[in-house]
């Protein structure tokens, strides 16, 4: 889902004459776009703060989750549980895989590319201020926000992680390994970490 401010014009600058910001808001494990939108009601600020709000959804997983199925905690493969393949700490694999270096164990699909392409698509259609591109994530989405900062710091101004964290094994964060990484070493990302 995409929420646009009144000033945003496709394929051009905004009607206010300045570029708009972009916030990608990522839901937590076993949530969806509607539930994160209700929990963190950012769309009410889209017009006054002049930013585009993108609310994508993670893939469905079919593992048991007491908070995600609609049948009182019993696995419901019809609805499943939406998650992000974020880090080795959380959550696409149905739980943390302590310090595993085998990405396939916790990354059954490539959400980094999915979110990267979403940001690129919005940037191609609207004039986005590159100093105002943020990923905000709650819980599993907060882990995914950290992952985006690790793998694509060049496209982000900052992240907000609410009850999320980074990799259990810090060496998996590509931005921290600038010697062996394709990530530019001068790409800095502001981080607001909220826990509680």
Predicted regions and their residues:
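Short hydrophobic segments within beta-strands
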Residues: 3, 25-26, 136, 194
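Proline/glycine-enriched tight loop/beta-turn segments at coil->beta junctions
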Residues: 7-22, 186-188
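Serine-hydrolase catalytic machinery in alpha/beta-hydrolase-like enzymes
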Residues: 17-134, 147, 151, 175
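Short beta-strand segments enriched for Tyr within beta-sheet-rich domains
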Residues: 20, 156-157
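Short beta-strand immediately N-terminal to the catalytic nucleophile in serine-hydrolase-like folds
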Residues: 135-137, 162
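Gly/Ala-rich beta-loop-alpha elbow adjacent to hydrolase catalytic centers
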Residues: 137-141, 145
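The feature captures the conserved acid-bearing segment of alpha/beta-hydrolase catalytic domains
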Residues: 157-196
